[in-house]
A protein has these predicted regions:
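NAD(P)+-binding Rossmann beta1-loop-alpha1 motif at the extreme N-terminus of oxidoreductases
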Residues: 1-60
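Short glycine-rich, polar/acidic loop-and-turn segments at beta strand-coil junctions
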Residues: 31-33, 62, 78, 133
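A short, aliphatic-rich alpha-helical micro-motif
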Residues: 65-67
């Protein structure tokens, strides 16, 4: 399966590693060029918790990450979701499954993040939410 993880902080990089190393999916990990987490992964291939599987395609090309994926995992700040999704929804999303991997509600509206995604054009029928332990260390044990 082709999976893209949008957001390459600790949680996003862990999810990409898990998808590639454990589940053996084909994975693209997207991050914004210039951000500390992306630049560290690009330079070192690792962060303080995981070393990226060599099969992971680390990219700052959002169109490539979205277009190639069957499943799109979003792992960014919950408060950035509404402003980020218009960048995603300008691409063809037909048949793509979205997994929101962030906790919380939208400040100011009190809306669940799945509601925010729907308002931004993500099909609610193709949206799942994955939250778990607050720290990736819990998964690495």
């Amino acid at each position: 399966m082709n999976v893209s993880v949008l957001g390459c902080g600790r949680w996003g990089s862990f999810l990409a590693w898990y998808q590639a190393a454990v589940l053996k999916n084909s994975v693209k990990l997207w991050g914004e060029a210039g951000r500390k987490s992306f630049e560290q992964l690009k330079r070192e291939g690792k962060n303080e918790y995981i070393t990226l599987d060599k099969s992971i395609d680390l990219t700052s090309d959002l169109q490539s990450a979205v277009s190639s994926a069957q499943v799109i995992i979003i792992s960014i700040s919950a408060q950035a979701l509404r402003s980020f999704l218009p960048e995603v929804t300008k691409f063809d999303l037909a048949g793509k499954i979205f997994v929101l991997c962030m906790k919380g509600i939208e400040e100011g509206t009190g809306k669940r993040l799945s509601e925010v995604a729907a308002e931004c054009g993500i099909d609610p029928q193709n949206t799942a939410v994955w939250v778990g332990p607050g720290h990736i260390q819990d998964f690495l044990k």
